[in-house]
Swiss-Prot record:
Protein species of origin: Photobacterium profundum (strain SS9)
Recorded metabolic or biological pathway in which this protein acts: Pyrimidine metabolism; CTP biosynthesis via de novo pathway; UDP from UMP (UMPK route): step 1/1
Protein name: Uridylate kinase
Source taxonomy: Bacteria, Pseudomonadati, Pseudomonadota, Gammaproteobacteria, Vibrionales
Gene name in the database record: pyrH
Family per record: Belongs to the UMP kinase family.
Superkingdom of the source species: Bacteria
Any one GO CC term of the record: cytosol
Length: 240
């Protein structure tokens, strides 16, 4: 049952992990998962919600792992940024096939492949009802795509950052290791820091906190969950 006839958010920043796109595959992009996610985003656009997207790159490349093996961290992070561009292009294509207008904006210039990130242009595109996919993270090494999601969310003045994961939200403890772990409905930023709960990395989290950007962590593998979040139904954990 929908509690609100209209969406409670006008503009959102949706953060998808790269792993979410690989579905049951061990690597790469699962076309079925990609198309399902594109359909869920399409539903939001049809509701009149403006959607900014940040996608991770972990399904294609993990810089941290190779850094441990001796690769220069900056090089690894640059490769990771390019992985997010590949995911962004795949998502744009899936959205176009679903008849949704979408643009990819990269934090590093890639002429002929996608647009370079431009704040004013991004706002203009969102207002026109286009989905804007922000690729290549922040454009800087040592910053995660969670940091990019919070940064872009703050820049475009989104109402909320929605972090789509494989778990139902934030638990009091690791639910895999501790069967008594409880799912939290609402948390304050300070609660998360004091209890050291895993929401996102500290740089991203403190950026959101300092700019009073609420975050909702929810399970996107459940069909319809994204729509439920936007319609104001209880789904996942709200941090504000």
């Amino acid at each position: 049952m929908t509690t609100n006839p209209k969406p409670i958010y006008q503009r959102i920043l949706l953060k998808l992990s790269g792993e979410a796109l690989q579905g049951s595959e061990g690597f790469g992009i699962d076309a079925k998962v990609l198309d399902r996610m594109a359909q869920e985003v399409k539903e939001l656009v049809e509701l009149g919600v403006q959607v900014g997207l940040v996608i991770g790159g972990g399904n294609l490349f993990r810089g941290a792992g190779l850094a441990e093996a001796g690769m220069n961290r900056v090089v690894g992070d640059h490769m990771g940024m390019l992985a997010t561009v590949m995911n962004g292009l795949a998502m744009r294509d899936a959205l176009h096939r679903a008849y949704v207008n979408a643009r990819v904006m990269s934090a590093i210039p890639l002429n002929g492949v996608c647009d370079s990130y431009n704040w004013a242009e991004a706002i203009s595109q969102l207002r026109q009802g286009r989905v804007v996919i922000f690729a290549a993270g922040t454009g800087n090494p040592f910053f995660t795509t969670d940091s990019a999601a919070c940064l872009r969310g703050i820049e475009i003045e989104a109402d909320i950052v929605l972090k789509a994961t494989k778990v139902d939200g934030v638990y009091t403890d690791d639910p895999v290791k501790n069967p008594d772990a409880v799912l939290c409905d609402k948390l304050g930023f300070q609660d998360v820091l004091e209890k050291e709960l895993k929401v996102m990395d500290l740089a991203a989290f403190t950026l959101a906190r300092d700019h009073k950007m609420p975050i909702r962590v929810f399970n996107m593998t459940k069909p319809g969950s994204l729509r439920r979040v936007v319609m104001g139904e209880q789904e996942g954990t709200l941090i504000s």
